[in-house]
């Protein structure tokens, strides 16, 4: 079982890599479940590119810090809280603001599986609103659209990924954006090839592996 410090450091590493890759900006946030009613998340005021473990706060599902102090979570903490509330097997939630995925939702283009690793994501549903998910009601609506899928698109806004580990969630956040980039670029030439259901299943059998996630 990882220690609290190790979990915080893994979150810090993930956020800083995503920020460096321009998958998140100054407002992106990532979390990890601590138990049934609390989770770790980077503070709303933290500078993502120079994040440290001191910038990770533990909050309950209502966004209240459980260890005292005045460090507050991001305003969109309901993204994380409502996923954890609805899906007990999920242990990590990332909210990113990537370019290519957002371009597609801005124009109403549905992401398709055009890249082998995106087979792990399956259908990629999209919210029909660009508004911040900063209330429990909005979080519940997002979770309803997401269902049991690993990712959901927020129209003209960003992406939410959910997984059983920080490593897996990081990989999903990268895969969805790489898939969007390839789909967009292929659309400049013609109609992108979309993996069939059978091809996606074969890819899932080979690609669902922590050792491969680590190569992301």
Q: Language-model segments: which ranges?
A:
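Glycine-rich flexible loops
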Residues: 1-216
